Amino acid sequence: MNPPFAKVSWATVTLLLLLLLLPPAVLSPGAAAQPLPDCCRQKTCSCRLYELLHGAGNHAAGILTLGKRRPGPPGLQGRLQRLLQASGNHAAGILTMGRRAGAEPAPRLCPGRRCLAAAASSVAPGGRSGI
């Protein structure tokens, strides 16, 4: 027979530890007087947790959603970063990224196999396409 505490999830244990350890650290008299670390001022390290604890706002919501957030620069730079880090054909994705930025896909004039037949019949005798 398993004891009742054997099925406690990792998230529950983490939350309990945060609730037990953070209030004394945050409410201590020296906590508010601590200066911002050099690495946070220079933006050379990840200081998201430090900013959550010492900044204004709902700290509990920020801490609970910290692991769920996916940071990434918006726009083309973020998409380029995701393309480079993902598996697959990087060259094809990067080469077509500019075209996909604001352009809508071109409408297909004819559905299915008829498009292939129309394209094949429009090729000029010199090998150039008449389309």
Swiss-Prot record:
The modification Methionine amide is found at residue 97. One of its GO terms (cellular component) is synapse. Keywords: Amidation, Cleavage on pair of basic residues, Cytoplasmic vesicle, Disulfide bond, Endoplasmic reticulum, Neuropeptide, Pyrrolidone carboxylic acid, Signal, Synapse. It is found in: Rough endoplasmic reticulum; Cytoplasmic vesicle; Synapse. The keyword Ion transport does not apply. InterPro entries: Orexin. The keyword Oxidoreductase does not apply. Residues 1-33 form the signal peptide. GO terms for molecular function: neuropeptide hormone activity; type 1 orexin receptor binding; type 2 orexin receptor binding. GO terms for biological process: eating behavior; neuropeptide signaling pathway; positive regulation of cold-induced thermogenesis; positive regulation of transmission of nerve impulse; regulation of neurotransmitter secretion; response to starvation; sleep; temperature homeostasis. The modification Pyrrolidone carboxylic acid is found at residue 34. The modification Leucine amide is found at residue 66. Disulfide bonds join 39-45, 40-47. Residues 98-131 form a propeptide. Specific enzymatic cleavages at paired basic residues yield the different active peptides. Neuropeptides that play a significant role in the regulation of food intake and sleep-wakefulness, possibly by coordinating the complex behavioral and physiologic responses of these complementary homeostatic functions. A broader role in the homeostatic regulation of energy metabolism, autonomic function, hormonal balance and the regulation of body fluids, is also suggested. Belongs to the orexin family. This is Hypocretin neuropeptide precursor. It comes from Sus scrofa (Pig).
